[in-house]
Amino acid sequence: AKNGPMLRVLAIVLLVHFGESFRNAVSLFFIRDIVGVPTIGAAYFFYFIAGFAAIPFWLWLGRKIGKHRAFMCTLITVAAVSGANLFLENGDYSVFFLLFIVKGFCFGGLQFLPIAMLADVVDVDSARSGSQRAGTYFAFLGFSEKIAIAFGTGVSLNIVGLLGFDPSGGVAASTDVGVWALRLVYCLGPIVFYGLALKLIWNYPLTPARHKRLQERLARRTERLAATRAHSSGAGQSSARPAEAASPWPS
């Protein structure tokens, strides 16, 4: 039988990573040419520091309100930051750094909450099939991420290039349409894909209550299997003892 939650998680991951790569492909150009930030390395340093520091928070929030709801909070926050970037002008360093750090704060949620959701999905498969196929599921997740990143990057760069943005010459060498294309791709492009992902997360079927019942079912199955094995092992040992006693060979 098909694993509905698994297919939904894969679709969500595809959309989110497509949106992220759609923006990331042109991040350097937006930061350098639109905002004019002179120290891009410093921006990314604080971005990743905020991201790694926030991982425990997002995992805690996932346990508190449910992983899919926490992931919704992550996407809504990132979408709001993306929309706010549209109003930045050259020289708005402080506002950009603030928004960039907030986006970095959400990095942990974007990366780890889908993995946590997939771990729950593995339990659905285990309950239905009785087997452990976590490795296969995570391989599918990794493949989906790579597909989304490849397509998102290619589509994004081609759009801004075809509409007149010149990466080597920056704003001065680009058309007005090309500069606006860069703004829209960086700021609004991800929001489209986040919105589609949010629609799938909104009525996500594997709620915390359902997952708890599923875990209890798996625990009962494990206990029954352990009891059956113990009974079979005990029966085998007891049947072997008379044969040993009746052996005609001297000890």
Positions of predicted regions on the chain:
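Short, intrinsically disordered terminal tails adjacent to the first/last structured region
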Residues: 223-251
